[in-house]
Amino acid sequence: MQGCQAGASIFFLIAANPDANHGASGGLGSRWIRTFSRIAPAGTQGMAGPLRSRVEELKRPWWRESSPLVLQHSEAARLAADALLERGEAAYLQVISEERELPFLSALDVDYMISHVRGVPELSEAQGSETLGQDLSMLSEVTSGTYFPMASDLDPPDLDLGWPEVPQATGFSPTQAVVHFQRDKGKSIKDLLRFLFSQAQTVVAVVMDVFTDMELLCDLMEASSRRGVPVYLLLAQEHLKYFLEMCYKMDLNGGHLVNMRVRSTCGDTYCSKAGRRFTGQALEKFVIIDCEQVVAGSYSFTWLCSQAHTSMVLQLRGHIVEDFDREFRCLYAESQPVEGFCSNEDPLMPQVPRPPPVTLAFGPAVPSATGSSPSSNSLSSIKHSPLLARSSYLALPGGGGRNDMGMGSSSPGPAYHEAGGQPSLYRQLSDPNHISPPGPYRANLSKLGASPWSQSSPALNHSSTSPLTLAVGSPLLPSSRPLLHFTRGVPALSRLPENGLPASQDPSLPRGRWVPGTALETVEEKKVSLSQSHDHLDRLSPFSKAGEAGGPNSRVTPDSSSLQHRELALDDRRLSLSHSHSQLDLLSQGQGVLESGSLRPGELSLENRKLSLNHNHGQLDLLPQNPKPQAPKIPSDAYSSAGPSKPSLDDRRQTLGHSQLDLITKFGPFRSEGPGPSCPPEPSPVRMAGVGSADEKRLTLGHSKLDLITKYHQLQGARQKPEPGIPGAPVSGHQNGSSNDLFAPEKRLTLGHSKLDLITKYNKSKFKQLRSRFES
């Protein structure tokens, strides 16, 4: 035993002796040999693998010297993986033991490799061994590690929907990153993605491993079909079945995904020397929005990731977007079409029956050039979507087969595709009773609950009728509304409220009131058109004319006790809205009806000539444009029962926004005379001559105080002193009450007139008044 130990020590000395003259290098070599001899297990020969050696070094805390970082391929790992693919897990463990290496594959890795391994494509026996060897050699030359894009027999798929270039502002700007954690419930990642989808304008590109969130798919469908934004989906082949299951539950196929491309992608392929291979998964997850920003991270498009799983994403801007743009182009070139969702550029895959074309609203479509094939420069791809140039998604709701897809509603349904000759996606698993509702409203029933959108799964529903349809019934179908027309002698329809009360609660108009047809026609003819070039909206009361016309068909009599109440309520509702001025001009249209019997033809024509719209000023004066019908003269006895407390017709008019001086000028001279009748009689010619010409019967707002004071004194003098020379002039309360009729021919409140017109008009009246005062 001692000899063995001495021999061992002598062996080490001999091994280290040739390096004794080399100084420190010899000491390091002998030290490494001693250490390896101590850690080497008994009964083993040769050196341990690199992974085992490094682990043993790191387990000893006293080891001070750090080994250099070696970035090289592990041949032991390659041999073990090939043995696993060719002969199974037992051969893998045997190679690990022989190479003195650690079992580096986990149980998850071993299961994936064994379940996804596939061999070389088998050839027929008639070819013989020579043909087999020749084909294998040619296959080895073609599928070498060198990439020959121009010699490829298959062109990569085109970005046929369009792909914009990276904006220059994005390419030259520095990288900006904002991190979003799923732990922050106030700012969830799903809400961020939905917001970005709603704001996209040029393109949306999604690379995702698992996609089972229905809300996110609806957002992408709305962006593609409603707003015409091209959408590209690259989904992992491993979890593609879950996406197809979601589409089956929603009763979706390729015909519904308008302006959207769905393709599958996978990872790299690992090949052994014997020809066994397996393909990895595509675990990249990022979203490109308009080639301006990228959202990348660990978030998957699943309900659990939005509610339970924790994840994080980075929202990136700047020139880093170009790297993601290049990566997406590479992934899209390597992707494969999805059965049932392939486009016209995939001739090898079964096509989904396309709906009939829709007549374009802006001319024929322009075929787009290819942009991703190697023969044509991939960087100069399509700059806009063909759907943006075409307006097929803007078709009217009954205009063709693509209407439902373009407008984002349900498509013709499963029955449509079955009639076309090819069943829709997973139709062999659907319920045989699942039939689209017949009739011309089949496309519109999706919004009413009869489509599979309102069902959890078509395979679980044994009835083609939606629960919402059973509960509500056929009234949900759109029906044409009959045209309503007025007939003579029918009750008046309820009109819009003018004083804040609906027609049913109006105290002045009972519910059983009948409006004759002639009165309604008169109201319609006398409606004043609203000027859209001004900012005012003057509302006139149409029923005031019908109530005061006093025609033979009207039921309102002069001696009715409710006449004053109705006229007062009608006058109160004559409120015109003015948005650009502080004054509200209220026009009394009923006075002209009561006074038309006493006006001379000359004054009536003069009044009609003043009914013009002043478009040069800021307000819209609405005046009766048709001559008032001659009302029957009402005797003064008819007003004896009205009561002395009833104010005059002008006093009952409510003015808003006028100055206090204007109100005093308007109402002062008549309130001091005491109560008068509610409706004035005919004005006497003496009173008309005593006041002045008809040009001085207009109240103006915004004038100087001198003009208003002068006018006030003129009215006071005309009231207190009758015209001399005509004895026996009646002076009574009726005359006092009829002083409001002095301004009857011209009851329009004018705002914003020029000073020259006002000065000219008032100088004419002042000259006559001042001369008569000085002479007396």
UniProtKB/Swiss-Prot annotation:
Residues 1-340 are annotated as: DUF1669. May play a role in MAPK signaling. Directly interacts (via DUF1669) with CSNK1A1 and CSNK1A1L. May interact with RAF1. Coiled coil: none annotated. Residues 523-539 have a biased composition (Basic and acidic residues). Residues 344-467, 494-565, 617-653, 669-694, 716-745 are annotated as: Disordered. Belongs to the FAM83 family. InterPro entries: FAM83, SACK1. This is Protein FAM83C. Keywords: Cytoplasm. PANTHER family: PROTEIN FAM83A-RELATED (PTHR16181:SF29). Phosphorylated by CSNK1A1. All members of the FAM83 family of proteins share a conserved N-terminal DUF1669 (domain of unknown function 1669) domain of about 300 amino acids. This domain mediates the interaction with casein kinase 1 (CK1) isoforms. Therefore, it has been proposed to rename DUF1669 the polypeptide anchor of CK1 domain. It is found in: Cytoplasm. The lineage of its organism: Eukaryota, Metazoa, Chordata, Craniata, Vertebrata. GO terms for molecular function: protein kinase binding. Pfam families: SACK1. Residues 368-385 have a biased composition (Low complexity). It comes from Mus musculus (Mouse). Residues 452-467, 554-563 have a biased composition (Polar residues). The gene is Fam83c. Its main location: cytoplasm. It comes from the Eukaryota.
